[in-house]
Amino acid sequence: AKGCPDIYKQDILPTFELEISPTVLSKLEKEWASGDGDKPDHPLASFKYEDTVITDAVIQLRGNPKWWFQSPDKMQFEIKFNENDKQARFMGLKSVLFDAARYNESFLRDRLALKIMRDVGVPAPCANNARVVVNGEYYGLFVNIEKVDSEFLERYFEFPDGNLYKRDDWEKKTNEEDKDDSDVEELIDADNYAELDAVMNIDQAILEWAAEAVLPDNDGAWAGGLNYYVYNDPLTGFNIIPWDKDATFTRIPHDVDPYKDIKPNDHGRPFYDIVTKTPAGYQKYVQAIEHVLKTGYDAPTLQARIDEWSAQIDEAAKSDPNKPFSDGDYSDALKELRTFVKKRAEFVEDWLD
């Protein structure tokens, strides 16, 4: 895999300047207030980063509309650069995504979770934080997160032309003009180890589940959630690509069992069950948890990272005029996150023993 695109480097806090016409801004605000799940595209007057100015991008709302009401003044955006010209890119990217989940009060959850996943060898999107300015005024601090799309696949996979599906409703996200989705049907229909092994990169899936279990994550493939993609790599079969890591760390108690725990109202995790119910699969899963702890979840390293990143974003977080929580909540969330990773690492260590 190639390294992260420059705009997601950990040692920068980029500022993106958006010029949005009054008409478009009022449409976006109405859509946000009404929880409009259609998320239509609107023309963006201009997108500026340092010396780069783009005037033919489009803007739309992003995130899950059912949570928007929790954050009345702080919309979340996707900016698309290739809607009007299919070849257009910004620093090699088709889109940028600005995420601000209501309960990510440290601003660091996705960023830390995805970094851990990349460190242990999971193909996971890149993320840092970014300041967003709207019509000349500071609008807020966001998680700046890489979109899982064809550009992402090109970065990670030797053969990036396979089918990508989003778990939510198994919607096809690449090669959409080809209506054949029999490959994912075969994956969904697999009901024993041999059938699954024929279509899925099981070792990769085990690593992905183990990483989510250690974090822990309450909404991905491991917990019986819907926040992940599957990519049918022509070389290895279906790989699991994690997504949306704001329901991680302090969203869950530090002592959830890395094997048994499952989210309330889960959506099932048939692939996980098939694999971990075989003695060999379970053995590999435990080894993967050990690997994640050793290569990605060293508490002092994570705490140093939290300290470094929180120093980087501190001024931007505190001066964010639209965040739906207080500076005190932000500071508390950082302290809780620091304490949590230590407790979690100790708990998983004991569980392995």
Residue spans for each PLM region:
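Phosphate/dinucleotide-binding and metal-coordinating scaffold of catalytic cores
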Residues: 1-353
